[in-house]
Swiss-Prot record:
It is an enzyme of class 3 (hydrolase). Induction: Repressed by MngR. Induced by mannosyl-D-glycerate. It comes from Escherichia coli (strain K12). The keyword Hydrolase applies. This is Mannosylglycerate hydrolase. Keywords: Glycosidase, Hydrolase, Metal-binding. A divalent metal cation binds at residues 14, 16, 126, 338. It catalyses: (2R)-2-O-(6-phospho-alpha-D-mannosyl)-glycerate + H2O = alpha-D-mannose 6-phosphate + (R)-glycerate. SMART domains: Alpha-mann_mid. Coiled coil: none annotated.
């Protein structure tokens, strides 16, 4: 009799390092479970495989306390029995950056090679939805297979669990969906009644959905020890289901069967974030916004600032500190695990997540300062007071720069490398204790104070490089006064901005004549959800600052003006007060709106003082545009999403596990457009948005979501059981202060032609400044060589392709440059001009393995497809 299906039983564990329990609690279980796993693999030849959840952080946690077992692990990996990798941690894919996903795979696969070969499957059994760019990233590591659970439904193009999945550039993987999850084979009973009760309905679903009738029954669960009697269970399965064949397999064997039927597979494209058959938690992007903001800020510091700066320094002769960078990367990658960055954890775990981010940020800040200092210390005029300006974007930038200089003088002159005076504006000045500069000064009895000047300058800084200004103490400088010709509260060549009575803004784009009104109005509403999902209260009451009485202070400086808008919102203290239409709670709002004299951007800092619970705060940016779609960036590209999800009309009748609310994630920017005119909103960490309004559309950017439970049952937008467990998490109410920032950019034409992606990256990559003075708390010896006073490593146009990463190669003396095309539909070429002679240029995989022959020069062949990244390795003279 031909088998109805072949059922592949794969022993595994899903290992959340932390969740409602801490890493240290799970580590104790890990030590226990690993001993059982190793003993079974060593002693039982029939127990062929064990999958270690696709992440090497498990091994790192284990070896921290059991280093003596490295050889035991290595033997089992080399034998193909213990299956490890390819990830470092089980990452989220919708709210972390492209480079974070790339480094997660890079470090995970490099860790694997110390023990054997990694599993070459993009294995994400529990992440909350799948980015449409994952096939492209997987291919960059030679991975052509993926296995996941969440996000698919038949509206993507098939109701089958096996298909081909493509990214926008055509990168392709073979996909196997786990339609009932990764734990349907957990704790399998050994008796017939128990097995039939569990599996009869499962087999019907699995076989109906399968093209190949190769069925997966993963034998494992969260923190589950291996099932000792699995062979007894398999014998019972063969007895009660004789029409099916049961085998112990590794996932690769299933994919071999799928790939043999490639011609029968549908081809799907795009992201998978449907919660029809399983929960994807579309609104988890706004939980614990303090952590989300820190995460984005530190990602940007490492990728946009530190790595390019370290590369500049390396090309000048200084050491590239791979070990320090790997340490900080791994700290934040631990936080990128889906539960951790989703922030659906206990308060104690969230405190540990914050601590890891603080450690990584402290390392990044100090290493940035170290590299700037090494460069400044080793210029020809090394003892002179200097201000060194670093531009880590690949085109020259004229920027208004706010920075601080310290010196032992009450006045100073600032000059450039040609001896010309540099005008500057003094924003603030204060005395500081000399011990804060260098404790050795006061150690020898010198207590004369230093002066600290916060200054503003307007300078052009070379592309991917730096320039030096010189500080002459006790000399009169070209100090200029504040200027303003504004008719409204703020004005420059591009914008006229006025204040409404409720504290919101009226904007006029002078070039296009387009008007925007009620911009930056704060909206407050209920949140009866949990750490996984937003859900409104049954008795909703939406409040805006319409009755606020704002106080507005205007500060005009030399090249920049700011409006500081302050007001309080009276809001319900909790859900009970909202139901009773009472409002004894309070949200303090301080908006700082900054307009530079030569900028199309309006930069906004939002400072909140939240003194209420169970609510959501959003900032609204109304536009005059009537459109049914919105553009947002994603990893290595951008995509258009509908303003409204049509599935919302019938989601309850169709039995969705959660409502398909049109609340989406971005990474750095989102844009609305009608005709040739558009408005983009840039953000750092505010990665959740919705577009609301009937005709004229409004951006609604989530600022804060306060909830008090990790999991909660029977939400309006997510009926049924709690996600996670019903654990109190008072810290997730986010009482107290929260600061965030965004920027508004108007443009004409397409987002691609206007360089919206490039402008967002530039906003997230501010010019860095280093003030070199003769004293420093920490001493450094000088290098045995000098560096130039001005330097530019490379140059690219401010449109077209965009840099994703600039770093030194991990294993050779070359520069790695990863570029991508951010456009959704247009191809583009890349032009890179190095200031140094290029001995050779090779194209590589994302793992930095060379794939093409070396070419002389820096010319890059062929156009970049939409959403395509390419990685190049340069050997410089």
């Amino acid at each position: 009799m031909k088998a109805v299906s072949r059922v592949h039983i794969t022993p595994h564990m899903h290992w959340d390092r932390e969740w409602y329990f801490t890493t240290e609690e799970s580590r104790i279980l890990l030590v226990n479970n690993m001993e059982e796993i190793l003993c079974r693999l060593e002693q039982d030849n029939e127990y062929k495989y064990y999958v270690l959840d696709g992440q090497t952080a498990i091994l790192e946690d284990y070896f921290a306390v059991k280093p003596e077992n490295k050889d035991r692990v290595k033997k089992q990996v080399e034998a193909g029995k213990l299956i490890i990798g390819p990830w470092y941690t089980q990452t989220d894919t919708t709210i972390v950056s492209a480079e974070s996903i790339v480094r997660n795979l890079m470090y995970g696969m490099r860790d694997c090679l110390a023990f054997g070969e990694p599993m070459k499957i993009g294995y994400l059994p529990d992440s909350f939805g799948m980015s449409g760019q994952l096939p492209h990233i997987y291919n960059g590591f030679g991975i052509t297979r993926t296995m996941f659970w969440r996000g698919c439904s038949e509206r993507h193009g098939t109701d089958k669990t096996e298909f081909l999945w493509q990214s926008s550039d055509g990168s392709e993987v073979t996909a196997q969906v786990l339609p009932l999850g990764y734990a349907i084979g957990k704790y399998l009973p050994a008796d017939e009644n128990g097995l039939r009760k569990r599996l009869d309905s499962y087999f019907d679903v699995l076989e109906k959905a399968s093209v190949t009738k190769e069925i997966l029954l993963p034998n494992g669960h969260d923190q589950m020890p291996l099932q000792q009697n699995i062979f007894e269970v398999m014998d019972k399965l063969r007895e009660i289901y004789p029409q099916r064949k049961f085998v112990m397999s590794r996932f690769e064997e299933v994919f071999e069967k799928i790939e043999a039927q490639r011609d029968n597979l549908a081809t799907l494209k795009g992201e998978f974030i449907d919660g029809k058959y399983m929960r994807v938690h579309r609104t988890i992007g706004s939980t614990r916004m303090d952590i989300k903001i820190a995460h984005a800020r530190i990602e940007n510091k490492i990728v946009n600032l530190l790595e390019p700066l370290a590369t500049l320094a390396w090309t000048l002769g200084f050491e590239y500190h791979h070990g320090l960078l790997e340490k900080m990367w791994k700290e934040i990658l631990k936080n990128h695990a889906h539960d951790s960055i989703g922030c659906c954890c206990s308060d104690k775990v969230h405190r540990e997540i914050v601590a890891r981010f603080e450690l990584a940020e402290d390392m990044a800040d100090n290493l940035i300062r170290f590299y700037m200092r090494k460069i400044a210390d080793n210029m020809p005029q090394s003892d002179a007071d200097k201000l060194v300006l670093f531009n880590l974007m690949p085109w020259p930038r004229e920027e208004v720069i706010n920075t601080t200089v310290r010196l032992r003088a009450s006045q100073f002159n600032l000059r450039d490398d040609r001896g010309q005076p540099v005008p500057y504006f003094i924003r603030h000045a204060r005395e500081i204790d000399p011990g804060l500069i260098d404790r050795q000064i006061v150690h020898y009895g010198n207590y004369d104070p230093f002066m600290e000047f916060d200054i503003q300058i307007n300078q052009i800084v070379p592309s991917m490089g730096y320039r030096t200004l010189y500080i002459e103490a006790n000399q009169p400088g070209n100090v200029i006064a504040a200027k303003s010709d504004a008719e409204g509260i703020l004005e420059n060549a591009f914008w006229q901005i006025a204040l409404n009575e409720d504290g919101s803004l009226q904007l006029v784009d002078k070039d296009s004549g387009v008007r925007y009104d009620r911009v930056l109005q704060i909206e407050e509403s209920s949140d009866d959800g949990d750490e996984y999902d937003y859900s409104p209260a049954k008795e909703e009451w939406v409040i805006t600052a319409a009755n606020a009485k704002p106080q507005c202070d205007i500060i005009h400086e030399a090249w920049q003006s700011r409006a500081v808008i302050r007001y309080d919102m009276a809001v319900p203290l909790n859900l009970s007060e909202r139901s009773a239409r009472q409002s004894t709670g309070r949200v303090g709002v301080v908006l700082v709106v900054t307009l530079s004299h030569n900028s199309r951007r309006i930069d906004v800092d939002i400072n909140l003082d939240n003194q209420a619970d169970d609510h959501r705060l959003r900032v609204l940016v109304p536009t005059p545009f009537n459109t049914d779609s919105v553009l947002a960036d994603t990893q290595f590209g951008s995509l258009t999403r509908p303003v409204n999800d049509s599935a919302m009309n019938n989601w309850q009748q169709e039995g969705w596990k959660e409502a398909p609310v049109p609340v989406w994630n971005m990474l750095n920017y989102v844009a609305l457009q009608e005709g040739r005119n558009g408005m983009a909103v840039f953000s750092e960490g505010l990665r959740e948005f919705e577009v609301i309004g009937e005709e004229k559309k409004t951006f609604a950017i989530t600022l804060l979501r306060g909830v008090g439970l990790l999991g909660k049952e029977d939400l309006l937008l997510r009926p049924g059981r709690p996600s996670g467990i019903k654990m109190p998490v008072p810290d997730s109410q986010l009482r107290g202060l929260l600061s965030c920032r965004l920027s508004l950019l108007s443009y004409t034409g397409t987002p691609t032609a206007a360089g919206v992606a490039q402008q967002a990256r530039a906003w997230l990559t501010p010019v860095q400044c280093y003030n070199k003075i003769p004293w420093d708390v920490m001493k450094l010896n000088k290098a045995g060589f000098n560096v130039p006073e001005s330097y530019s490593l490379l140059k690219m146009p401010p449109v077209g392709c965009l840099i994703s990463a600039l770093k030194k190669a991990e294993d050779r003396q070359e520069v790695i440059l990863r570029l991508f095309n951010p456009a959704e539909s247009a191809t583009c070429d890349a032009t890179v001009a190095f200031s140094r002679e290029v001995i050779s240029c090779s194209e590589t995989m994302m793992d930095e393995h060379i794939t093409t022959e070396e070419n002389q020069g820096s010319n890059l062949s062929g156009p970049f497809l939409p959403g395509q990244s390419r990685t190049f390795s340069y050997r410089l003279a």
